[in-house]
Amino acid sequence: MQPFVYTTAPARIVFGTGSSVGVAEEIRRLGLSRALVLSTPHQKGDAEALAARLGPLAAGVFSDAAMHTPVEVTKRAVEAYRAAGADCVVSLGGGSTTGLGKAIALRTDAPQIVIPTTYAGSEVTPILGQTENGVKTTLRGPEILPEVVIYDAELTLGLPVGISMTSGLNAMAHAAEALYARDRNPIASMMAVEGLRAMIEALPGVRMEPQDTKARETALYGAWLCGTVLGAVGMSLHHKLCHTLGGSLDLPHAETHAVLLPYTIAYVEQAVPDQLAPLAALVGGRAGTGLYDFAARLGAPASLAALGVGGEDLDAMAELATANPYWCPRPVEKTAIRALLQRAFEGARPE
């Protein structure tokens, strides 16, 4: 066995249907007393209801979290945090809300409690992606990692089926890239395979019966594992392309992951098929084409064109993605990446 380093994320995980009733207890356990509740505008009502349940432990609600964590929104949130005299944040929602909580923590050292309502997985990573002037950058550090994550499947029962599918594929992208990361290790790989297995088991069940609590629990379990391995190893081509297109073209985050994943995995698979063999075994056939077929069965968006990307955008995106690429086991060449984007734009089966 080759030598390796595995760094575990020092977060407290509270998992179980109905567990979100313990938010107040978690705030007190941290020795805190003034929580600013965060959400997107869409989940403002849920955030206000949570703040009402917290009573005097709630310092207020900030409900303007947005995709790709725009720096201008973060500045307003930090002002609200300080004006409210808050001493922690409670992030209720998906990756956008979690990202805002991380951005506030980075600037104020605020402890974070996250209650995920999607399968994004970012709640267990020490990674923050934020956007300024149309450019998305990524930061990593222990101060970004939330202190407590509460997984309650009841809070995902209202997640629309379409978003559930793309959010789940987003989580799977984290685990898929962990299998061939430069700093991969057997512990992270084991968690990645289990996370992928859980998502592949759960998502068809969620699609067929959105109120199936058992399937929702399995999906949350898979999302936790997939997100955890993203925090334990480095990112590669897939996340680079998603960050480039998402930040530059303001594309929906999970949907971008869902569309690109089969193509990026097929690209890398040509260089390291053995490392992606566990994923190939789970989806059947080859990893890239198997993911393409799996996403199609879930009814996920099939092309970049369906997300609003124009053919005229592809040259610039290929240029940006290859100007400062993440490490990748297969050389990242502009011509090859442009061809990858073309197939993803058309929704053609990966090569």
From Swiss-Prot:
- SUPFAM superfamilies, alphabetically? Dehydroquinate synthase-like
Read off the InterPro entries from this record: ADH_Fe/GldA, ADH_Fe_C, Alcohol_dehydrogenase_Fe, MAR
Q: Which superkingdom?
A: Bacteria
**Hey, which pathway is this one from?**
Aromatic compound metabolism
For this UniProt record, the keywords arranged alphabetically read as follows: NAD, Oxidoreductase
Question: What triggers its expression?
Answer: Induced in the presence of gamma-resorcylate.
What is this enzyme's class at the first EC digit? Answer: oxidoreductase
- The Enzyme Commission number assigned here is 1.3.1.32
What is written about domains in the entry's comments? Answer: Each subunit consists of two domains: an N-terminal NADH-binding domain adopting an alpha/beta structure and a C-terminal functional domain adopting an alpha-helical structure.
Q: Of which family is this protein a member?
A: Belongs to the iron-containing alcohol dehydrogenase family.
Name the UniProt record assigns to this protein? Maleylacetate reductase
Phylogenetic placement of the source organism: Bacteria, Pseudomonadati, Pseudomonadota, Alphaproteobacteria, Hyphomicrobiales
